[in-house]
Amino acid sequence: MEIRVFRQEDFEEVITLWERCDLLRPWNDPEMDIERKMNHDVSLFLVAEVNGEVVGTVMGGYDGHRGSAYYLGVHPEFRGRGIANALLNRLEKKLIARGCPKIQINVPEDNDMVLGMYERLGYEHADVLSLGKRLIEDEEY
């Protein structure tokens, strides 16, 4: 397995992977999300590749105060092999190298499998309520 930075030629393969991982939401256009990331620190957008196939992704961010991780997904046939752990570990190292003191990940409360993975990796529940406001409406995907 190789972990590397997203490249333009990964575009369609990544969107297909996100569909298989059930990461897409009607209010988020994944093509726009990728375009936005490519214009803003693409070095934190990582893919895991096995035999030339993109099998995992994580899209990281850092605002100078806190890091974040989105679109963490691993192809169903490749789960249980440590790919998600490796992607998060690489992202964390990149964030630490930038002086990032902490990382935040939003997870649906009912996603027990993923919550367990994050807890095993040292992530803790934060007693905060996450609020959001859409500033630019994407077309329904």
From Swiss-Prot:
InterPro entries: Acetyltransferase_YpeA, Acyl_CoA_acyltransferase, Bact_Acetyltransf, GNAT_dom. Keywords: Acyltransferase, Transferase. Pfam families: Acetyltransf_1. It is an enzyme of class 2 (transferase). Its EC number is 2.3.1.-. Disulfide bonds: none annotated. Gene3D superfamilies: 3.40.630.30. It comes from the Bacteria. PROSITE patterns: GNAT. One of its GO terms (molecular function) is acyltransferase activity, transferring groups other than amino-acyl groups. Residues 1-141 form the N-acetyltransferase domain. Belongs to the acetyltransferase family. YpeA subfamily. NCBIfam families: PRK03624.1. This is Acetyltransferase YpeA. It comes from Shigella flexneri. The gene is ypeA.
